[in-house]
């Protein structure tokens, strides 16, 4: 579905937008450290670990016995890097909880039978996905879950706006249901503010299709994502 290309794009954007990204990455790492302070975490699971730009691996690897970095694909550089950290491992897995395979199979069925795409039934329970006594971090991934799935579906089948919204809702709500089963930290974009060429706020776009879970500690910050105006 284009995962490797997408991760390469993230790193290229980071190098291009380093000034605007650094504060966001620092905020993410500091938020994680504050939330984990004085918690006796034995196993930490990171969903959407990617390039580890926003995760304080060096510090936490010395404090937590087991750290599992979970993503659909791990860059070779990251696979080599974690070999220097005992107790840290890369796990390749579908962080949507099986939805990627489900949508892929549904497309194949519709093409084989030459029938319109129908929204697949979903019966998978979130219980038992994570090991007992694990602590989970959803790391800047919630509003990204649908991007590659929808891009793939658009290349294969006609896709209406209502179906796109349904997919986004399902992926985000399923993700939140997964988090309900364990202690967790959620870091996510929830709103996109577009700035016009004169430097004034132009459009606000909601990025979430699922309700936040109750939390004891929250923090908001702005991420200057695209100062060069190349994002679309």
Where are these regions (language model features)?
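Conserved beta-strand signature within the Rossmann-like core of class I S-adenosyl-L-methionine
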Residues: 137-138, 160-172, 178, 182-189
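Class I SAM-dependent methyltransferase Rossmann-like catalytic core
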Residues: 1-41
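S-adenosyl-L-methionine
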Residues: 83-130
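Conserved SAM-binding loop of SAM-dependent methyltransferases across substrates and taxa
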Residues: 50-64
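Charged, low-complexity C-terminal accessory regions
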Residues: 190-232
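Conserved SAM-binding motif I beta-strand of class I
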Residues: 66-71, 92
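Conserved class I S-adenosyl-L-methionine
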Residues: 40-52
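A short SAM/SAH-binding and catalytic strip from SAM-dependent methyltransferases
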Residues: 115-127, 131-154
């Amino acid at each position: 579905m284009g995962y490797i290309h997408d991760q390469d794009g993230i790193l290229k954007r980071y190098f291009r937008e380093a000034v605007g990204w650094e504060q966001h990455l620092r905020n993410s790492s500091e938020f994680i450290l504050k939330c984990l302070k004085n918690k006796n975490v034995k196993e930490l699971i990171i969903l959407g670990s990617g390039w580890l730009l926003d995760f304080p691996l060096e510090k936490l690897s010395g404090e937590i016995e087991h750290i599992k970095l979970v993503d659909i694909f791990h860059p070779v550089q990251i696979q080599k890097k974690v070999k220097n950290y005992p107790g840290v491992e890369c796990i390749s897995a579908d962080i949507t909880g099986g939805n990627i395979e489900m949508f892929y199979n549904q497309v194949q069925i519709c093409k084989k039978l030459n029938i319109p795409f129908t929204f697949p039934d979903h019966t998978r329970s979130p219980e038992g996905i994570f090991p007992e006594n694990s602590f989970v971090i959803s790391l800047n991934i919630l509003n990204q879950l649908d991007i590659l799935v929808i891009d793939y579906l658009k290349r294969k089948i006609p896709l209406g706006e209502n179906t796109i919204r349904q997919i986004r809702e399902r992926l985000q709500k399923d993700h939140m249901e997964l988090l309900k089963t364990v202690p967790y930290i959620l870091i996510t974009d929830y709103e996109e503010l577009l700035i016009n060429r004169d430097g004034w706020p132009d459009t606000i776009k909601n990025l979430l299709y699922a309700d936040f879970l109750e939390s004891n500690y929250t923090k908001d910050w702005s991420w200057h994502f695209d100062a060069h105006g190349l994002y679309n």
